[in-house]
A protein has these predicted regions:
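Single conserved hydrophobic/aromatic residue that forms the stacking wall/gate
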Residues: 1-6, 10-11, 153
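Conserved small-domain helix->loop->beta segment predominantly found in fold-type I
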Residues: 7-8, 12-37, 47-62, 90-99
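PLP-dependent enzyme catalytic core of the Aspartate aminotransferase-like
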Residues: 56-152
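Generic non-transmembrane alpha-helical segments
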Residues: 39-49, 81-88
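Generic detector of bulky aromatic hydrophobic side chains
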Residues: 2, 47-49, 71
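Generic alpha-helical secondary structure signal
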Residues: 35-39, 73-76
Length: 154
């Protein structure tokens, strides 16, 4: 299995100091992976994390700010999720391509995926579950096609 850092098949820190450390923001470079940064970000939602900032300041990267307000236990949970996602990338990337998996999708009578509902919704044991509100949407379309809804009541 590829390591999380130091390999062409990993998610690398894009910027780091000469001593190898990063600041409170880490920019993970996903450009060498067989999936996109968006795929990884959406899968993080299945693990109960808020999707990180995407493609800023570099295309196909994720900016994560883990140390601002998170406990050590939460940081360990994030690292575990990233390690699991790394495995999924090379074992069954469809699970990333279809993420996030909502409660509605997982509980539907129709299941068309080549992985289990449990793998989709509960990739790790958790005492509670954060369910994403919506499944995969086309973020780029939304960014490029601004729709302004202004309701004026007189």
């Amino acid at each position: 299995m590829p390591s999380l850092v130091g390999s062409e098949m990993c998610i690398r820190d894009r910027y780091k100091a000469e001593n190898g450390r990063v600041a409170h923001e880490c920019i993970f470079d996903c450009r060498t992976l067989p999936v996109t940064a968006e795929d990884v970000a959406k899968r993080l939602m299945d693990y109960g994390f808020h999707a990180p900032t995407l493609s800023w300041p570099v295309t196909n990267t994720m900016m994560v700010e883990p140390t601002e307000s998170e406990s050590l236990d939460e940081l360990k949970r994030f690292v575990k999720a990233m390690e699991m996602i790394r495995r999924e990338i090379y074992m069954d990337k469809d699970i990333l391509k279809n993420a996030p998996h909502t409660a509605r999708v997982v509980s539907s009578d129709k299941w068309v995926y080549n992985y289990s509902r449990e793998q989709a919704a509960y990739p790790v044991k958790q005492n509670n579950k954060f369910w994403p509100a919506v499944s995969r949407i086309d973020n780029v379309y939304g960014d490029r096609n601004l729709v302004c809804l202004s309701l004026i009541h007189i």
